Amino acid sequence: MKAKSFAVPSSALSPDGYIINQGLLRSVSFGRYTAADCGCGWISAYNLLHFLTGTRDMETICRDVEKYVVLRGRLGVNFLGLWWYLHHRRGCRFRLTLTRWGTERVCRRRKAPCGIMLYFHRHGAHYITFVPGSDHSLRYLNLVYGRACDERPLKDVFRAHVLLPLTPTLIYLGPTRRAS
């Protein structure tokens, strides 16, 4: 079996180590495709774990999340598989919201909200990570390829990018009891 290559160009990373340009990951295989085509799920998992733990082990996260691809990766990662990986394998506890309003409500209660959102746009679906920004805004990672500091209110993201109101979102609540 052919070994899968893994090389993330430094131009795909923000200065603080997040993956912000999925389009540059043509050399990273994911399922039967490339991370540039269908890798937003593992990229979101990496970005969230990088925020929470400082990890830079991209390849391990990519290969672990690859187990949950749909149609050999053509449709990216199964949402429940991504949750399973982050919850059971990485010890993250989440609150699930399904709408912008639910996400805003839960984020307002959190001191430093972060999480992963799956949204639908004209060309399909896309996972992004959000972490705390400045002045009560959120910083979005891998939303606009190459933008390292994309900070704005959630309603502006919905207005500019989101087609359907259903947006499954995992908002980090803390470690699971087993991981504590």
Give residue spans per PLM region.
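Noncatalytic regulatory segments and standalone regulatory/sensor domains
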Residues: 2-13, 108-111, 131-180
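Generic detector of well-ordered alpha-helical segments enriched in charged/polar residues
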Residues: 59-66, 83, 104, 155
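...with weaker cross-activation on analogous glycine-rich loops/strands in unrelated enzymes
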Residues: 78-131
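Active-site-adjacent structural segments surrounding the nucleophilic cysteine of cysteine proteases
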Residues: 1-71
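Short coil/turn linker and secondary-structure boundary residues
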Residues: 56, 77, 149-152
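Intrinsic-disorder/low-complexity loop/linker signature
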Residues: 17, 101, 123, 177-180
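Extracellular-facing segments of soluble proteins and assemblies that are Gly/Ser/Thr-biased and enriched
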Residues: 63-85
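Short flexible/disordered coil segments
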Residues: 67-69, 116-133, 157-164
